[in-house]
Amino acid sequence: MTVLAQGCDVAPPNNLTKPVRHESGQREVFCGLTGIVWLHRKIQDAFFLVVGSRTCAHLIQSAAGVMIFAEPRFATAIMEEKDLAGLTDANTELDRIVTQLLTRRPDIKLLFLVGSCPSEVIKLDLSRAALRLSQTFSPGVRILSYSGSGIETTFTQGEDACLASLVPELPAASGKDASLLVVGSMADVVEDQFVRMFEALGIGPVQFLPPRNSATLPSVGPNTKFLLAQPFLADTARELENRGATRLRAPFPLGVEGTTAWLRAAANAFAIDPALFDKVTQPARARAERALDNYRKELAGRRIFLFPDSQLEIPLARFLSRELGMQLVEVGTPYLHREHLAEELKLLPPDVQITEGQDVDLQLDRCRLARPDLVVCGLGLANPLEAEGMTTKWAIELVFTPIQGYEQASDLAELFARPLVRRAKLVA
């Protein structure tokens, strides 16, 4: 089958001079099942059961790197040819597997049935299966479902679908006092840093979605204000707004500038004295700015090309251009959510070329023509581009690595400096 590429330019945001290029064609992305790799570590009493093929099982196993004698909190109910052909009742087999799993693992309190490309192709209704199984195993186990399929999605949308499925389960907030909800997976160490910062500012109560334990689901209601920690949570944000919560407009907490603006949005919403805000944040800001100085020398003036991969590209481009002095050749993103990224777009250079969507062949042609100093791309493109003499950075590493907050600003900068240093050593 031939996929026809379609490209068009759409009006740029107010501060940008170049139209946003929109492309539709062949893509190079992982599927949403990849999100299980970090989500199963985050929610410590949850289990993710993928209903999919052997390919799905190999993807998760290799991406997570779990040793064979470990007892991980994910598995794959493998669909055989007879299931795909409709020769067996997939629901009966799924019920058997879930019963066996929960009998063996009584520590599981939250079970996600995760759809895949094969289960969606045969129209297996996992939402009905989750409802049916919940009636059997509640209240001891909560059973939910979401899609991790790679059909017309990118890999970070797996987390969005997972969290969106959790929102209807969140308890209703009681009382009239305002509360803050931070939405999006972050490393525990990063969460702890933000908790200390919010406590010093006098902001609270502060809760996180996803929680570390399903028994401590955050409450939500009309007095809930929420900050997005990740830019790929459109469905989750919409579900929270349907519950009455209010999203705080802010850049994302990448780098010194982004973290400060993100924290300031919360401080303003809770009427925190600006003098107190400066006093609390200044020490960490100063440390982060000093740490970035070393990497700025290496990265300033370097040209970078970002392929669409994770939806982190716009915040990363802002950080790289404004705090490290890099030149943006092209910033690709799988999907441009203009409302959630409005504060980021205001901070980009006015002449930046943004591409929404992907036609991988056309983007490869532009990348080869530009010959940037550094290319941020998926694993499938990295080795071929390296063979052509380009320096690459794996985009997926930016999702697996703790990069939010002041203390991680230098770690984020190092991720971009490291490939250039490696290349310099190889050619020396």
From Swiss-Prot:
Cofactor binding description: Binds 1 [4Fe-4S] cluster per heterodimer. The cluster is bound at the heterodimer interface by residues from both subunits.
Task performed by this protein: Component of the dark-operative protochlorophyllide reductase (DPOR) that uses Mg-ATP and reduced ferredoxin to reduce ring D of protochlorophyllide (Pchlide) to form chlorophyllide a (Chlide). This reaction is light-independent. The NB-protein (BchN-BchB) is the catalytic component of the complex.
Coiled coil residues, start to end: none
Enzyme class: oxidoreductase
Residues annotated as transmembrane: none
Lineage: Bacteria, Pseudomonadati, Pseudomonadota, Alphaproteobacteria, Hyphomicrobiales
Keyword field contains Metal-binding: yes
Designated name of the protein: Light-independent protochlorophyllide reductase subunit N
Required cofactor(s): [4Fe-4S] cluster
Binding site for [4Fe-4S] cluster: 31, 56, 117
Organism: Rhodopseudomonas palustris (strain BisB18)
Pathway involvement of the protein, from the record: Porphyrin-containing compound metabolism; bacteriochlorophyll biosynthesis (light-independent)
The EC number(s) this enzyme carries: 1.3.7.7
Gene Ontology BP annotations: light-independent bacteriochlorophyll biosynthetic process; photosynthesis, dark reaction
Gene3D superfamilies with a match to the protein in the record: Nitrogenase molybdenum iron protein domain
Keywords: 4Fe-4S, ATP-binding, Bacteriochlorophyll biosynthesis, Chlorophyll biosynthesis, Iron, Iron-sulfur, Metal-binding, Nucleotide-binding, Oxidoreductase, Photosynthesis
Family that this chain belongs to: Belongs to the BchN/ChlN family.
Catalyzed reactions: chlorophyllide a + oxidized 2[4Fe-4S]-[ferredoxin] + 2 ADP + 2 phosphate = protochlorophyllide a + reduced 2[4Fe-4S]-[ferredoxin] + 2 ATP + 2 H2O
Description of how the protein assembles with itself and partners: Protochlorophyllide reductase is composed of three subunits; BchL, BchN and BchB. Forms a heterotetramer of two BchB and two BchN subunits.
SUPFAM superfamilies named in the record: Helical backbone' metal receptor (SSF53807)
GO molecular function: 4 iron, 4 sulfur cluster binding; ATP binding; metal ion binding; oxidoreductase activity, acting on iron-sulfur proteins as donors; oxidoreductase activity, acting on the CH-CH group of donors, iron-sulfur protein as acceptor
